[in-house]
């Protein structure tokens, strides 16, 4: 089959100057086409800082969409983990599971990470249920055989039948992660690889 021609027009324009004036922890803006998920992405000093705090700094159970505190904030690591709550009202990552449960990948296999420097489009190559201590959360700064093995392993775990883009040690991926249910250590993850650069 012909390789997918990925979208090149960003879905929205983000005023990062205004966002960073509100909170310098804002690192990007995530937009998931098939799910119409659209939120600023922050990074705190640890992974608890934004669990129940909005990007504007107010206390809120839904919290924020946030980068793993150990990741570089420019998405230059081999894999970058992005967390969000599985909200019953479908806010944050409440709709993420629809990628599998409602076969939303059929609508679009792309999501965007917009940053002050770049508008990057990612192609979803895997989505699956896993556990909080899963090796999907092992961080790789990039390169090396171990990272390639990781990519192959995660692609093979996919529970949705999506086309596999070519990936190698120079690839950059984002892991979108949410809780599978409120009272378990289960997680649901969606993985995408950067296509435009």
In which residue ranges do the predicted regions lie?
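Solvent-exposed, non-transmembrane regions of membrane-associated and secreted proteins
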Residues: 1-197
